[in-house]
Amino acid sequence: MNQNMKRLPYGINDFEAVIEQNQYYVDKTMYLPLLENQPSNIFFIRPRRFGKSIFLSMLHAYYDCSKKEKFQTLFGDLWVGKHPTPLQGKYQILHLDFSYVGGGIEKLEENFNMYLRVKLDGFMRVYQEFYLADFKERFFKSDSGTEKLALLQDETATKNLPLYLIIDEYDNFTNTVLNEQGENVYWAITHADGFYRDVFKKFKGMFERIFITGVSPVTLDDVTSGFNIGWHISTKPEFNQMLGFSMEEVRKMFAYYKEVGGIPAASDIEAMIDEMKPWYDNYCFSEDALHTQSKVFNSDMVI
């Protein structure tokens, strides 16, 4: 077995770690120019364990101005390394994962605000060179996540600093509320003056680009009447294989591990794929792609 064989990144959602630790990465960077040609605020829905988090981590690494100097290290061997886009390394990134927001309904708004505060403080530490000392002092003194968001919005608008918002698991805690607390409680946080709907209103004019993922369109429909500018690409055929693995990507992976001795040299790759297909390969997210593209494998199950 080749000692330099790339390890499979099972359960790892950190793109930088995958690349820097020489783990196997299925290149999805060819979708970046397609995404840039879409409207600037995107919603993308896929089932759980389909590679959403590592895809967002890749977006973060690519567009983050604080990582601009690492472009060749992280992306040099990938498609976009040879075809960089105009927006590479342009943005300050606020990356949120709402699966970290939890607790009982009586604490949900408080926990959400606390999570937002922690993430915004981390944001300011990364990009502090762009902000004056008096603003940073006011920002860090505030103990409210929504107040910090408002302060940041005013300051970045004044300075014309471009921001990119990435949200993973946007519907995580709202789906839990709907399932466990019922429609009335769910309605209270996602409609009218509900805190979750309200924060989406704040996002509306603040970020130059937004990319949001989750597993269900239910919350999307409820909060975006306040947001009112999202572009839903989940069923567009050109993005059908953006997450998960295509048959060709699985074939390429098996060929690599066969070559380096990770699987027996006598392995029949096509037979392996045929055996997997009934279990892991029956996903198609676009009606227009149903007869023109191969079905998509669940990436977590393949790995």
Report residues per predicted region.
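Walker A/P-loop-proximal flanking segment of P-loop NTPase domains
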Residues: M1-Y63, K67, Q72-G81
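P-loop NTPase motor core
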Residues: G11, D27, A61-R125
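Short secondary-structure boundary/capping segments
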Residues: L59, N111-N113, N179-V185, P217, ...
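A short beta-strand-to-loop transition that corresponds to the Sensor-1 phosphate-sensing loop
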Residues: S99, D168-E169, F203-N228
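Short glycine-rich substrate-engagement loop in P-loop NTPases that contacts/grips substrate
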Residues: A133-Q153
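Substrate-engagement module of ASCE P-loop NTPases
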Residues: L151-T158, V185-I210
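Conserved P-loop NTPase "ATPase switch" module shared by AAA+ and STAND
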Residues: K159-I189
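Amphipathic alpha-helical segments of the small helical/lid subdomains adjacent to P-loop NTPase cores
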Residues: T219-G226, I233-I303
